[in-house]
């Protein structure tokens, strides 16, 4: 089983075979429109605009599991992101990333990369989650905007914590292009 074996639905409900992304560098992100990290959409779009011609694709999976910060329908989320942040990358149907209803793609991603690579803000971020009563099991997605970086061969090479900004992983992306 690998990244290209999955089929997901896009924001309009159309089936998308991830095998269509073979040979591309992928940044897979679980997102929300009403999160303190939502401004990362702007930086994601900048990365996409700068590197899509070289083979970068960003796959956006909205998720409402973290304090219900993505309450809109998938189609509405796509519209909000396009209007507010000018996003042009692929937005998929809303999914769950933890628990009994975890999307199979995310179960796979978490099994391959169970630990977040954090930055200087990550420890504080995890402590804030704990203070809010947000308990996570080992390997769980901690919050919105966790990012998985996949190379051109479909190998998941890194999992970045929500606090790691798109700008901070630009060099990692460039190295794979």
UniProtKB/Swiss-Prot annotation:
InterPro entries: Glutathione_peroxidase, GPX_AS, GPX_CS, Thioredoxin-like_sf. The keyword Oxidoreductase applies. GO terms for molecular function: peroxidase activity. Pfam families: GSHPx (PF00255). The keyword Repressor does not apply. The active site is at 35. One of its GO terms (biological process) is cellular response to oxidative stress. It comes from the Bacteria. CDD domains: GSH_Peroxidase. Keywords: Oxidoreductase, Peroxidase. Belongs to the glutathione peroxidase family. Important in the cellular metabolism or defense processes particular to this pathogen. This is Glutathione peroxidase homolog. The gene is gpxA.
């Amino acid at each position: 089983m690998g990244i290209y074996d999955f089929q997901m639905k896009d924001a309009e409900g159309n089936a998308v075979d991830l095998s269509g992304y073979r040979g591309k560098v992928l940044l897979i992100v679980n997102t929300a429109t009403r999160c303190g990290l939502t401004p990362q959409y702007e930086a994601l779009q900048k990365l996409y605009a700068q590197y899509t011609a070289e083979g970068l694709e960003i796959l956006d999976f909205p998720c409402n599991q973290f304090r219900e910060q993505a309450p809109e329908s998938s189609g509405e989320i796509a519209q909000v992101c396009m209007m507010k942040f000018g996003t042009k990358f692929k937005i998929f149907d809303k999914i769950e990333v933890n628990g009994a209803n975890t999307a199979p793609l995310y179960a796979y991603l978490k099994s391959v990369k169970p630990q977040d690579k954090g930055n200087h803000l990550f420890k504080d971020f995890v402590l804030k989650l704990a203070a809010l009563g947000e308990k996570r099991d080992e390997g769980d997605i901690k919050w919105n905007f966790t990012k998985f970086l996949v190379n051109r061969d479909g190998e998941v090479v890194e999992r970045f914590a929500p606090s790691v900004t798109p700008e901070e992983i630009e060099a990692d992306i460039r190295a794979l292009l």
